[in-house]
Design a protein with these regions (language model features):
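Short Pro-Cys-Gly-centered "Cys-loop" motif that presents a nucleophilic cysteine in a tight turn
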Residues: 1-45, 53-158
Length: 158
């Protein structure tokens, strides 16, 4: 399990409009859901957090799976493709050039159950910490509501 996070270069906002959040999550679904289980996420205007477990190769949703066995950087490239696609779309939409994210994205291995539980709380409370909202229920760009819901979701609640 990994805590994956990054922020805009020089603290720049990476999400400027509501549609940016939607697009980022659609790219996440395209590139990351096939290779990782997601336990929690939060998108803030200038940074993001994900708590994920990289799937075993045999669990990957088919995407040239036979090539992944030989490619140890396959999963990292999926994340890179997502971030690059998003940065290119923001650069085009807002007439900007250059990098959008601090590079490379950061990741911390989560090995202890207590740390895993703490990370779920940390990620969901991030909008409160940064004073965007007073409680996590008020923030829509996180997995908080899906985490507590019984409705079907791509979020791994196990």
């Amino acid at each position: 399990v990994y805590h994956i996070y990054n922020r805009g270069i020089n603290g720049e906002n990476i999400f400027r409009e509501e549609r940016n959040y939607h697009y980022f999550l659609s790219l996440y679904a395209k590139y990351v859901f096939p290779v990782a289980d997601t336990f929690a996420y939060c998108l803030l205007k200038n940074h993001f957090h994900f708590l994920v477990r990289i799937k075993d190769v045999h669990e990957f949703i088919p995407d040239r799976v036979q090539n992944t066995v030989r490619d140890k950087n396959y999963v990292s490239r999926k994340f890179s493709h997502m971030f690059n696609s998003y940065a290119q779309s923001i650069n085009t939409a807002f007439n900007r050039t250059g990098g959008l994210f601090e590079t490379p994205f950061k990741r911390k291995k989560v090995t202890a159950e207590a740390y895993f539980t703490a990370m779920i709380g940390y990620i969901h409370l991030n909008p409160v910490k940064h004073k965007f909202v007073k409680s996590p229920e008020e923030y829509i760009w996180s997995s908080y509501h899906s985490f507590l819901s019984n409705r079907p979701t791509k979020l791994n609640r196990d």
